[in-house]
Regions:
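Small-molecule-sensing regulatory modules
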Residues: 2-44, 69-82, 87-93, 101-285
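Short, structured active-site "lid" loops
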Residues: 46-63
């Protein structure tokens, strides 16, 4: 059986998060001196380290079987690949921005204007839908400086926090699309590689299911069990086990981080003691 070939960005935040996810799936990938190809000794997986904008092409051509890449690159390259999993990290948006001192009246403002971008395909589709006639200035980097040096009237680029726009005296005026890290797959995988992919997706799901959840254990008087259970969500229902001390039980459940802080005072008011909150590495549903 051949290895499943996974394309990953060769450096940067997306690369770090991708390798972190694979590691949380208990798959360790060794890296060669040139960091072009990596192998796993405990799972039939081979990693190809590529430029992120090359990943859709490599996956579409079958050089890589799957890839972890920003959705923005998938939309821009528009290759024959299928998004099979959204990963929830490396979130950003693709937006139009203009100088802060301009009084923006709506998307029609871009008629007859010049827009600098590294994502011409996505922008062209958006402008066509909006019936906007603008000139595109395609550049490969430092898009945000284009208005300041007179290259363009506005820009279309990735926005995360928006701090880069502010530092270049720009303001975001139109959000065209959202993006996050996704897993894409080549069409027509062999049955053998599909089986490996299914196993990998199962591991990834168990890791993703655990995110933001905690295992909670507490001791409570039996008279308060029904009240406590009513505010503990659990996966099906909380586990209740009698303690050696008469009239007391131990209650176990799974709770989301944000929910715990909303109910902890109620738990204490109902007599809960010895509350333990434990991280969950993996959760199979």
């Amino acid at each position: 059986m051949g290895n499943l070939k996974l394309a990953i960005q060769k450096s940067g935040r997306l690369s770090e998060k991708s390798l972190e996810l694979i590691g949380e799936c208990d798959i360790q990938i060794t890296q060669g001196k040139r960091k072009l190809v990596g192998f796993s000794n405990d799972f039939p997986l081979e990693a190809l380290y590529l430029r992120d904008d090359d990943i859709p092409q490599y996956v579409a051509d079958g050089v890589a079987d799957i890839g972890i890449v920003g959705e923005n690159e998938v939309l821009e390259k528009d290759k024959n690949v299928e998004i099979i999993k959204r990963l929830g990290f490396s979130r950003c948006r693709l937006s139009l921005a203009i100088p802060q001192d301009i009084d923006y009246s709506g998307v029609e403002w871009f008629n007859g204007k010049k827009i600098a971008t590294s994502y011409p395909h996505i922008l062209e589709k958006f402008l066509k839908v909006k019936n906007i006639d603008a000139q595109l200035e395609v550049i490969s980097g430092s898009v945000e400086i284009a208005p300041g040096i007179g290259l363009a009237d506005g820009i279309f680029d990735i926005v995360s926090s928006g701090s880069t726009l502010v530092s270049n005296r720009l303001k975001e005026v139109e959000v065209v699309c959202q993006s996050e890290a996704v897993i894409v797959a080549t069409p027509n995988l062999s049955d053998e590689k599909q089986k490996i992919l299914d196993d990998l997706m199962f591991r990834i799901d168990t890791v993703k299911n655990s995110k933001g959840n905690k295992y909670i254990l507490l001791n409570a008087p039996n008279k308060s069990i029904d009240k406590i259970i009513s505010i503990l969500p659990g996966m099906k229902s909380p586990t209740v086990m009698p303690l050696h001390e008469e009239g007391w039980s131990s209650i176990h459940s799974v709770v989301h981080d944000k929910d715990f802080w909303q109910i902890v005072d109620q738990l204490k008011a109902y007599g809960a003691e010895g509350i333990l909150v434990i991280p969950i590495e993996k959760m199979i549903q």
